């Protein structure tokens, strides 16, 4: 190949594939904790510089090409919904659009030329977490305008958020910088302004996905982050790690592999 994938990228992707394609007999005893929600989350911990975006491209290619080849296989989906933490990241993720001029699938040889037509059968939507926000009944009650329409139903909400993908079912969600997406712990409320803002963002992000899952079903939610921690109120950060991490290539690993420059 012209472009060799990093070991950490292959390790991450092979783990995700194995969790779906391996026989159940091989997965006996493996129990991946839930985040407490109704849809499944899987987290890949990969340090900055480890190539998370390329792994996302590999994940999308694997999902879409398999679904295009085996339409009846419910383990796969051709509908990909990517949530970014900001406009800058969202712009950077445009390389995951299958028809883009600078797409990673062709640029890094993720998909052979002969399979590009199958890949293009998929639909990839990239949005910002703010797009998941909606007005609650409480917020509507405080509205001073004459517009007193109630909160949107899940169906209306999903149609607005998903747009051209509104009729999709069994959607694969990819959370980039997923440490911004966690379920609020009632026993650990944010105290500072920054903590309250982080809590608000996390609540909007995850609750929005809950509504999408309720109306359209989320096949699986794949989290990517270099720092997948959620506030726990405990002094030991390790206790705040996402419980659903399935592969871990941290900062020290990245430095040893030469993917990350040694801090001075």
Where are these regions (language model features)?
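RecA-like P-loop NTPase motor core of helicase/translocase proteins
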Residues: 1-264
């Amino acid at each position: 190949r012209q472009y060799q994938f990093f070991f950490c990228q292959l390790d991450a992707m092979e783990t995700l594939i194995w969790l779906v394609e391996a026989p159940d007999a091989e997965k006996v005893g493996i129990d991946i904790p839930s985040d407490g929600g109704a849809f499944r989350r899987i987290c890949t911990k990969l340090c900055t510089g480890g190539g998370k975006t390329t792994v996302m491209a590999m994940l999308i290619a694997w999902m879409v090409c398999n679904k295009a080849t085996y339409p009846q296989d419910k383990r796969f989906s051709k509908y990909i919904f990517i949530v970014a933490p900001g406009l800058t990241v969202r712009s950077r993720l445009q390389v995951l659009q299958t028809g883009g001029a600078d797409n990673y699938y062709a640029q890094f040889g993720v998909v052979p030329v002969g399979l590009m037509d199958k890949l293009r059968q998929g639909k990839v939507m990239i949005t910002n977490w703010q797009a998941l926000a909606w007005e609650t009944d409480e917020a509507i009650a405080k509205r001073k305008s004459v517009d007193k329409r109630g909160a949107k139903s899940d169906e209306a909400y999903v149609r607005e958020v998903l747009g051209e993908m509104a009729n999709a079912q069994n959607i694969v969600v990819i959370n980039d910088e997923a440490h911004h997406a966690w379920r609020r712990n009632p026993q650990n409320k944010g105290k500072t302004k920054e903590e309250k803002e982080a809590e608000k963002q996390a609540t909007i992000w995850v609750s929005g996905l809950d509504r999408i899952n309720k109306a359209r079903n989320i096949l699986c939610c794949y989290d990517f982050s270099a720092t997948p921690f959620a506030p726990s109120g405990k002094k030991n950060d390790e206790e705040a790690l996402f419980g659903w991490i399935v592969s871990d290539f941290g900062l020290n690993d990245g430095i040893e592999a030469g993917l990350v420059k040694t801090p001075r």
